[in-house]
Each structure stands twice: as C-alpha cells, then as structure tokens.
C-alpha cells in the first residue's frame, strides 16, 4: 500500500470521518465501518484532503485539462483539489454546477471556468453513480470530454449486480476512476495496526460477503 494511502486512512480516522462499529448502509447492509467525507469540515482538514486528492490524481496518470465538481460536495472538493494541484505546479481551471438554474447574473447551472477539453470529475464517493452520470451529461452537452473521476474512497462492494458502483461507472461511461484509498487499502492498514485488530475480522467478513475483485 502506498504511504500516502496509509496516511489518508490514518487522517480519516483522526478526523472521525472513518469509524468502526455497526452501521447500516443505504443499501440496507450492516457495515463494520462508516466513511463520511462531510466531516472534513474545517480549513486545515480540507487543505490536507485536497493534497491527498492531488497526489492520487497525479499518480493515476489520467490526462485532463480542468476539474469539475458536482453539486454539492464536489464543489469544495474540486476547488480545493485545484488549489493543491497549483501548489504542486499544475494550475488548471475548475467549474461546478448548481442544482437550480439562475435567471440573473451569470445565469444557467454552470459556474466557474468554461467546460473545455478533457474534464476530470471530483467527488467524495460513488454510491449509485447518479452524480457522475449527470456530470458526464453536462460536460458532453458543453462540447467537452469527460476524462475520469477522482474520489476519496472506493468501498469495493457490489451494487445490485455483480459489479461495484465504481466498476459500473467505469463500464457505463468508459471512464477511469481513481480513489485515494480503497477497501483493500483499509484492510492492509488494519492488518498493520494492532490497536485496531478487533475490527479486522468484521471488515474481512464484509468484503467476503459483498466485495468485488479489484
């Protein structure tokens, strides 16, 4: 496991974004862990998160010209990732959408730089894939090309069929999806963290029941 992925998991635990216990997912499954990126909710944690996104994006090798953040969580994530990339010497434009169109000021649903070239979508997780699908439609309608999707965590679990939500997005839209960390990374972290050993069997069992191959 790359050091930055291990660092990200530790960071998420420290911020209580990642928790262990018994949780019910949207799909009604009993999960031994819970990830809530909305708890990266202060300046310093958002700055650190943005640097993890930038590292993951650069390591992925995905070619892109700009960033797009789907409303609402993706808005701050795209802006922050753009700042972190600039900090590392890669300055790219970013844009985001509104849920409701404005009929005054700049109008419309899109805000920020014009959508041009290859556009990388930034979001926290992929659940049903609705946000990505809407983003792809917006990007293509503007005459630009979706380049891929960058997320914080890939749970690597099946949706309604045999594929995970991430795999479904990759297959349906022909896009690469890069995650800062995955369930596989989380298991590796637990295996090397004696203080968290009590949670390892539950996470392994969850992956055995609902997991997909990477």
Curated annotation (Swiss-Prot):
Classification via PROSITE patterns: PUR_PYR_PR_TRANSFER (PS00103)
GO MF, one example: magnesium ion binding
Keywords assigned by UniProt, alphabetized: Glycosyltransferase, Magnesium, Pyrimidine biosynthesis, Transferase
Signal peptide: none
Catalytic activity from the UniProt record: orotidine 5'-phosphate + diphosphate = orotate + 5-phospho-alpha-D-ribose 1-diphosphate
Residues given in the record as orotate binding sites: 34-35, 127, 155
Domain of life: Bacteria
Pathway linked to the protein: Pyrimidine metabolism; UMP biosynthesis via de novo pathway; UMP from orotate: step 1/2
SUPFAM superfamilies listed in its UniProt record: PRTase-like (SSF53271)
Function: Catalyzes the transfer of a ribosyl phosphate group from 5-phosphoribose 1-diphosphate to orotate, leading to the formation of orotidine monophosphate (OMP).
Family statement drawn from the similarity comment of this UniProt entry: Belongs to the purine/pyrimidine phosphoribosyltransferase family. PyrE subfamily.
Assembly and binders: Homodimer.
Entries under PANTHER family matching the protein: OROTATE PHOSPHORIBOSYLTRANSFERASE 1-RELATED
Protein name: Orotate phosphoribosyltransferase
Taxonomic lineage from the root: Bacteria, Pseudomonadati, Pseudomonadota, Betaproteobacteria, Neisseriales
């Amino acid at each position: 496991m790359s050091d930055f992925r291990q660092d990200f998991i530790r960071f998420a635990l420290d911020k209580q974004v990642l928790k262990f216990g018994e949780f019910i997912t949207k799909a009604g499954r009993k999960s031994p862990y819970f990830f809530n990126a909305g708890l990266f909710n202060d300046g310093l944690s958002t700055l650190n998160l943005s640097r993890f996104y930038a590292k993951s994006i650069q390591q992925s090798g995905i070619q892109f010209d700009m960033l797009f953040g789907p409303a609402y969580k993706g808005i701050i994530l795209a802006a922050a990732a753009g700042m972190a990339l600039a900090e590392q010497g890669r300055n790219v434009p970013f844009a985001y959408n509104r849920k409701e169109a404005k009929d005054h000021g700049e109008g419309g649903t899109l805000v920020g730089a014009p959508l041009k070239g290859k556009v990388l979508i930034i979001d926290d997780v992929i659940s049903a894939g609705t946000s990505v699908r809407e983003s792809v439609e917006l990007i293509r309608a503007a005459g630009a090309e979706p380049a891929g999707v960058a997320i914080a965590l890939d749970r690597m679990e099946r949706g309604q069929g045999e594929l995970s939500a991430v795999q479904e997005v990759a297959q349906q839209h022909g896009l690469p999806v890069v995650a800062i960390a995955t369930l596989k990374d989380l298991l590796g972290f637990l295996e090397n963290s004696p203080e968290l050993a009590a949670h390892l069997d539950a996470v392994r069992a969850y992956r055995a029941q609902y997991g997909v191959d990477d």
